[in-house]
């Protein structure tokens, strides 16, 4: 979107680049600019069309340098009135948009410095002009000369004002600091030879040596170290010059610093050493250099994370390999009790996991309260899961209670993580390795039912999952598997075919008597609101929930195929009577049930729910086998 500015009877669109000019103005300046433009529009009379005037080349200084020595007006008034804020802004941006006046002349001191005019500076000094007075940013001409790298001007000012050599700007920057930042080595050397203090820091406590390391300027570092700059000075984060050079993998600078007395075990505010920085950022050459100079390979930060742990977390494989070759301890845990193997499994880095497996203590893993299997399964890292299982990690190691409490469902097994992620392959891997599907507070089978994944359900049931699972925190009088499958009749029938017990659905406490009011929507999803034990929910109560009640008839019809002579309670009868097409269901429930049906139930009960899958092996006619398996319901 552009802003339109009216100029003498015509409009010119200003794009977003020009509009961005105003972003640096304060609210008061914007108001002033609007007033000036409004007054100009009112007083401007009809004139011929203006022509664009080319402006002179605009040399913008890097800083504001108002070397104003007197508040008195100039001897000769300007030829025209000074520009308002609006015209000044637009003039600064482009001379092609508006007719502008000549720009204000550059301060002669700054002009002389930028042009390297030593004679002009000497003349000013001889004329008595004070060049040791700072501007509003605290900058001296000495700072300008160092900033622009004008060695001749710098020497003139040094000789004239030797007491200003270490004077600081408002940002606590010395001329030496500015020369280092701008990498003007001749100015840097001149200042040091003149006695400049090399360890004066800016507001962030960064010294010239630190900035030289930041810019990877080895020659500047060498000069500063030769003039006794403190190689162990710390910035406000506690970082030394060696920390900075290590983070940039600058071996030449590191060599100079260590030769100049830099401590390889210096720690920042988080107890991080240069070697820790090298491992964390994957700087292998720097890491080798520090290890060669005696740095502690097992250094730990304030949160107890080791250099090896950080390298694993950031997946620096070559760094991990080097640290292990130097004897790094893979059994140092961080403050959360996690080992490098844990974080490598979480990241899913197969190669790092393979390197850590032979050197990781199983005892330390058990003490951590969480298995790498949990982390690999949680993040769907199947290759890592296979490696851990091949290394014979206990597939049934539970999460520690304090870690299980971090999950709302209080999960404890690696199998549960795989099922929650609907990862069929990982589920099969864990079950084949001996995972117990009945260890969690909430059965993984219930999660699989919620996902509607028949393959996962079949795997769990084939490996012994309890098909009549209940939820201890939400007690029901009937299996929770039925509760979870009610909204999908084909899924409900699948579970009933496999032996789910439907009898409890028709064992109502209230029978033919009056029932309490139907539950409000969502009751069965809510956690208990007080410390009282939750009441046991009857099947008819759950069926009366608004989101389920419209399926009451078909649900009862399916369940009746898997139970014998049962009595429908008054609430179930109400549901059936609410829709005339369901009358046949009520008739179906009337005892006695067909003898063939009762015999089928008797045979299935004798076989047992865990052996239902073996029905095909019975020495019976195929037609009878199909009847027992509910493949022929006629």
From Swiss-Prot:
Residue ranges constituting the UIM domain according to the UniProt record: 26-45
Subcellular locations according to the entry: Cytoplasm, Cytoskeleton, Stress fiber; Cytoplasm, Myofibril, Sarcomere, Z line
Domain SOCS box: 580-634
Pfam (any one): Ank_4
Ranges of biased composition (kind: Polar residues): 49-60
Post-translation changes: Monoubiquitinated.
Swiss-Prot/TrEMBL keywords: ANK repeat, Cytoplasm, Cytoskeleton, Phosphoprotein, Repeat, Ubl conjugation, Ubl conjugation pathway
Region (Disordered): 35-81
SS bonds (residue pairs): none
Function per UniProt: Substrate-recognition component of a SCF-like ECS (Elongin-Cullin-SOCS-box protein) E3 ubiquitin-protein ligase complex which mediates the ubiquitination and subsequent proteasomal degradation of target proteins. Mediates Notch-induced ubiquitination and degradation of substrates including E2A and JAK2. Required during embryonic heart development for complete heart looping. Required for cardiomyocyte differentiation. Involved in myogenic differentiation and targets filamin FLNB for proteasomal degradation but not filamin FLNA. Also targets DES for proteasomal degradation.
PANTHER family: ANK_REP_REGION DOMAIN-CONTAINING PROTEIN (PTHR24126:SF14), ANKYRIN REPEAT, PH AND SEC7 DOMAIN CONTAINING PROTEIN SECG-RELATED (PTHR24126)
Protein name: Ankyrin repeat and SOCS box protein 2
Gene from which this protein is expressed: Asb2
């Amino acid at each position: 979107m552009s802003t339109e500015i009216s100029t003498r009877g015509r409009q010119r669109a200003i794009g977003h680049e020009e509009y961005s000019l105003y972003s640096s103005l304060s609210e008061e300046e914007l108001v002033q600019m609007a007033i000036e433009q409004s007054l100009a529009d009112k007083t401007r009379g009809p004139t011929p069309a203006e022509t664009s005037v080319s402006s002179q080349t605009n040399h913008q200084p890097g800083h504001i340098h108002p070397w104003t020595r007197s508040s008195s007006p100039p001897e000769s008034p300007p030829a025209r009135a000074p520009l308002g804020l609006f015209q000044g802004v637009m003039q600064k941006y482009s001379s092609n948009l508006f007719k502008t006046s000549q720009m204000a002349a550059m301060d002669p001191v700054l002009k002389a410095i930028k042009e390297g005019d030593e004679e002009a500076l000497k003349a000013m000094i001889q004329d008595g002009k004070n060049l040791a007075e700072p501007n509003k940013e605290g900058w001296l001409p000495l700072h300008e000369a160092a900033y622009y790298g004008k060695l001749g001007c710098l020497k003139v000012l040094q000789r004239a004002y030797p007491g200003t050599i270490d004077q600081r700007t408002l940002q606590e920057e010395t001329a030496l600091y500015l020369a280092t930042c701008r990498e003007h080595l001749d100015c840097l050397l001149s200042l040091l030879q003149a006695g400049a203090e090399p360890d004066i820091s800016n507001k962030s406590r960064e010294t010239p040596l630190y900035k030289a390391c930041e810019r990877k300027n080895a020659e500047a570092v060498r000069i500063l170290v030769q003039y006794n700059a403190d190689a162990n000075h710390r910035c406000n984060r506690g970082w030394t010059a060696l920390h900075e050079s290590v983070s940039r993998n600058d071996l030449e600078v590191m060599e100079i610093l260590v030769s100049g007395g830099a401590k390889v075990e210096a720690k920042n505010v988080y107890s991080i050493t240069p070697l820790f920085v090298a491992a964390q950022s994957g700087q292998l050459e720097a890491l080798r250099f520090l290890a060669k100079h005696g740095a502690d390979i097992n250094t730990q930060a304030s949160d107890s994370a080791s250099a090896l742990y950080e390298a694993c977390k950031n997946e620096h494989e070559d760094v991990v390999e080097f640290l292990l070759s130097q004897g790094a301890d893979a059994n140092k845990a961080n403050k959360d009790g996690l080992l490098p193997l844990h974080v490598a499994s979480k990241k899913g880095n197969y190669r790092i996991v393979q390197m850590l497996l032979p050197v990781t203590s199983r005892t330390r893993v058990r003490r951590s309260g969480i298995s790498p299997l949990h982390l690999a399964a949680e993040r769907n890292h199947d290759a890592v899961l296979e490696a851990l299982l091949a290394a014979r990690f206990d597939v049934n190691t539970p999460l520690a209670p304090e870690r299980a409490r971090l999950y709302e469902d209080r999960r404890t097994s690696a199998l549960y993580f795989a099922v929650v992620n609907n990862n069929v392959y990982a589920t099969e891997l864990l079950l084949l390795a001996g995972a117990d599907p009945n260890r969690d507070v909430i059965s993984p089978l219930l999660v699989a039912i919620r996902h509607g994944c028949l393959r996962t359900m079949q795997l769990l049931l084939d490996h012994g999952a309890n098909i009549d699972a209940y939820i201890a925190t939400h007690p029901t009088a009937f299996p929770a598997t039925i509760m979870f499958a009610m909204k999908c009749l084909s899924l409900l029938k699948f579970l009933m075919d496999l032996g789910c017990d439907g009898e409890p659905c028709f064992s109502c406490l209230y029978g033919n008597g009056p029932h309490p009011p139907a539950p409000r929507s969502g009751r069965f999803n809510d956690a208990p609101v007080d410390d009282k034990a939750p009441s046991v929910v009857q099947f008819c109560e759950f069926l009366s929930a608004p989101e389920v009640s419209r399926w009451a008839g078909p649900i009862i019809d399916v369940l009746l195929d898997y139970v014998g002579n049962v009595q429908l309670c008054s609430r179930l009868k109400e549901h059936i009577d609410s829709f005339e097409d369901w009358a046949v269901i009520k008739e179906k429930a009337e005892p006695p049930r067909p003898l063939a049906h009762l015999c089928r139930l008797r045979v299935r009960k004798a076989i047992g729910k865990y052996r239902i899958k073996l029905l095909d092996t019975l020495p019976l006619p195929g037609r009878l086998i199909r009847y027992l398996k509910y493949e022929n319901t006629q």
